[in-house]
Amino acid sequence: MNGWKKIYLLAYLLVLTAFTGCGTKIVIVQKADGNSTIEMNLELGKVFEKVLDESTAALNEMSGKQKPDFFYADEIKKSLANAGLKNVKVSSTERTKLNVAFTGKFEFIEGGTNSLNLKLNPESVKKFASSLGSEFNSIMDLFMAPVITGEELSREDYMETLAAIYGKELSDDLAKSTIELTLESASGKKKNFPIPMVQFLMLNEEKNFSIE
């Protein structure tokens, strides 16, 4: 599989984390052989869970499911394996929780024995979103994320827009939420990066997170 497909898959998981509340952790470990292991632990926030349930209520009624799962572990595992990733592990013990781990070589991760650099490029997120099916894009449409739409908004304007449509509870929830990113070099050197959710949603340029 080509490198873009791997970028798309990571972009999908990163975009997903932007709506999962404060229970999101990502660990990237550089291996001596040049591969990287990525582990993600995601948990939907209560507010986002409520918004998803309300937004899909009509479809759920048609399918006869009151509370369908949000994550389908087998399908996610198959997609990651088909992209050429190794040691793929995916589990979802509850409808609001997802644990993912896999190993591979990625163009957006560069590292040596004592160094590691992760590049988040909004262009790869946009390209990925346009290639996805209607289900994922429907979720993205709900939140009108500037990283996807390309619209130039101030942080204040974006939060006010979300509050006007979905209520202040949701906008406040996103405003205080973070992605807890941990990088670990091949030598075991670690560094933590708390990334504000809103900063990711409004990503409009390449961001680098590094251990040197």
Q: Language-model segments: which ranges?
A:
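Post-signal peptide N-terminal segment of mature Sec-exported envelope proteins
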Residues: 30-50
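Bacterial N-terminal signal peptides that target proteins for export
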Residues: 1-9
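Bacterial signal peptide processing site
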Residues: 23-25
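Post-signal-peptide N-terminal segment of Sec-exported extracytoplasmic proteins
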Residues: 43-75, 139-140
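Mature, soluble, non-transmembrane domains
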Residues: 77-212
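C-terminal motif of bacterial Sec signal peptides marking the signal peptidase cleavage site
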Residues: 18-21
